[in-house]
Swiss-Prot record:
The active site is at residue 139. Residues 359-566 are extracellular. This is Serine/threonine-protein kinase PknE. PANTHER family: MITOGEN-ACTIVATED PROTEIN KINASE KINASE KINASE 20-RELATED (PTHR43289), SERINE_THREONINE-PROTEIN KINASE NEKL-3 (PTHR43289:SF6). Belongs to the protein kinase superfamily. Ser/Thr protein kinase family. SMART domains: S_TKc. One of its GO terms (molecular function) is protein serine kinase activity. It is found in: Cell membrane.
Length: 566
């Protein structure tokens, strides 16, 4: 690979001190790096000379990043920043502990079916969110799936993978690993749609179940197999795999894209249904445990005052007009950050937050007179978007509850209006943490036939602001007696009214625009479906519903919350 044959450990790259080479691939090298401006440890991907000098790639990467920026899906790994320094493109990402699925399969062999289904479902959630936003991944494979110790799965390399053409991948030698998961239409002149990602995810499911990709051999034979060979049956490869998985794999890997599942969620649901009843419970438990697990906090490292670094060039490229400074530079004042969720990362131990920043190229504009704000305390109340809802609470809260509601359900409104204030107080006091879930099963009872989904989408737009108190306020406001629509009413609420409600509780313009544009409708549909499945796992018959981690809470007892938090 050009430009990165030798490790650059111990050297400086702009404001980044490259500490350790942690990954190397066809598109670039990945380093554990110290960001000396923001005083944190990150994963830094340095793109190869070939890609960095390719104006088409540069343009596509910008475009794909903007598209991926609409994603607010917890299983998509985001980046902190990207740009160009000294003519080399880079991507700055959060560094956490984890292992890619390919390494896990090499070490452990095939996964138990419940675990395989749980991992594929999480990746399917990420892909469905991307597809709803008009983005495709194009390189779904075990190497691009990161699994934490708690089996929380992340899909990486969004933006980079889709910005790179198949021809470029071939030139860089990346196609060998990718071929095992490429849909037949990608080998022809046919236009590949998002269903190529569904095909690839099905191949990943097959490999998780059996320990090997569906087709093996040299490049030409694998390509030919994808196009012409019969779809293999996992039950004949590994004893103990339910025969029902044969049909799941056959549909997901159908040669004709139109014969495949419509969404990755459909694939995941079919895979879950193929499990034996006991294994379905195990898969649900794996998902629940992975979602409850606290996401790791990025590590930091003290930085000496007066650190020296070369300044970056603007994204437009060109020969840098300056050299390294002759004296220490002050910390630069930066322009306001443009908040986006750029879903792109690398095959290393990475995990992401929800709101991420694409900064304008920083410029030195004089010394700063104040120190940077301290990081929040480790026990601070935080917000995390989950596969089926939103977590609000502190890591030290002794009790975590699940609350399920439907936006036009009258008893749900009564429940929230009665207890929201006390719940908020308990969360602020770190006595309680809450996983909020919103469902949409009453859509057809609303005047617009989709109000519940629109309300769920609005809640995720607000969650994207990453403000726990704001989210809880908006969730409660949806059920206000002067706002909540009723079943079979002559009217419900418009997107403009939902946006105004968000504005009244303090949402920023980005969240308001998200609501008005309907950007999160696909995410809402997926997450509401996931929430319904989670609710079904508790054998609940409807909403409102409260679960304390071990049993159903009788919320009709006025003292239920006091009893719960002692």
């Amino acid at each position: 690979m050009d430009g990165t044959a030798e490790s650059r450990e111990g050297t400086q790259f702009g404001p980044y001190r490259l500490r350790r080479l942690v990954g190397r691939g066809g598109m670039g090298d990945v380093y554990e790096a110290e960001d000396t401006v923001r005083e944190r440890i990150v994963a830094l991907k340095l793109m190869s000379e070939t890609l960095s000098s390719d104006p088409d790639f540069r343009t596509r990467m910008q475009r794909e990043a903007r598209t991926a920026g609409r994603l607010q899906e917890p299983h998509v790994v985001p980046i902190h920043d990207f740009g160009e320094i000294d003519g080399q493109l880079y991507v700055d990402m959060r560094l956490i502990n984890g292992v890619d699925l390919a390494a896990m399969l090499r070490r452990q062999g095939p996964l138990a079916p419940p675990r395989a289904v749980a991992i594929v479902r999480q990746i399917g959630s990420a892909l469905d969110a991307a597809h709803a936003a008009g983005a495709t991944h194009r390189d779904v494979k075990p190497e691009n799936i990161l699994v934490s110790a708690d089996d929380f799965a992340y899909l990486v390399d969004f933006g980079i993978a889709s910005a790179t053409t198949d021809e470029k991948l071939t030139q860089l030698g990346n196609t060998v690993g990718t071929l095992y998961y490429m849909a037949p239409e990608r080998f022809s002149e046919s236009h590949a749609t998002y269903r190529a990602d569904i095909y690839a995810l099905t191949c990943v499911l097959y490999e998780c179940l059996t320990g090997s990709p569906p087709y093996q051999g040299d490049q030409l034979s694998v390509m030919g197999a994808h196009i012409n060979q019969a779809i293999p049956r996992p039950s004949t490869v590994r004893p103990g795999i339910p025969v029902a998985f044969d049909a799941v794999i056959a549909r997901g890997m159908a040669k004709n894209p139109e014969d495949r599942y419509v969404t990755c969620g459909d694939l995941s649901a079919a895979a879950h249904a193929a499990l034996a009843t006991a294994d379905q419970d195990r898969a649900t438990d794996i998902l629940r445990r992975s979602q409850v697990a606290k996401l790791p906090v990025p590590s930091t490292h003290p930085v000496s005052p007066g650190t020296r670094w070369p300044q970056p060039t603007p994204w437009a490229g060109g020969a840098p007009p300056w050299g390294p400074p002759s004296s220490p530079l002050p910390r630069s004042a930066r322009q306001p950050w443009l908040w986006v969720g750029v879903a792109v990362a690398v095959v290393v131990a990475l995990a992401g937050g929800l709101g991420i920043a694409l900064a304008h190229p920083w410029r030195s504009s004089g010394p700063r007179t104040s120190a940077p704000p301290p990081p929040p305390p480790a026990d601070a109340v935080e917000l995390r978007v989950l596969n089926d809802g939103v977590f609000v609470g502190s890591s030290v809260a002794p009790t975590t509850i699940d609350i399920f509601n439907e936006p036009i359900c009258p008893p749900c409104g009564s429940f929230i209006r009665s207890y929201a204030s006390d719940i908020d107080t308990a969360v602020a006091d770190k006595q309680l943490a809450v996983r909020y879930h919103l469902l949409n099963f009453l859509d057809d009872q609303s005047h617009s036939k989709n109000y519940s989904t629109r309300a769920v989408a609005a809640s995720y737009c607000v969650a994207g602001q990453n403000d726990p108190k704001l989210y809880a306020s908006f969730y409660s406001a949806l059920f206000g007696s002067d706002f909540q629509p009723q079943e079979n009413a002559a009217s419900d609420r418009t997107d403009a009214e939902l946006a105004h409600l968000a504005q009244t509780v303090g949402a920023e313009p980005t969240a308001i625009s998200c609501i008005k544009s309907g950007a999160d409708l696909g995410t809402a549909q997926t997450k509401a479906t996931n929430a319904s499945e989670t609710l079904a796992g508790f054998n609940a018959s409807g909403t409102p519903f409260v679960w304390d981690g071990s049993m159903v809470v009788n919320y009709q007892d006025p003292s239920w919350l006091a009893r719960l938090i002692g």
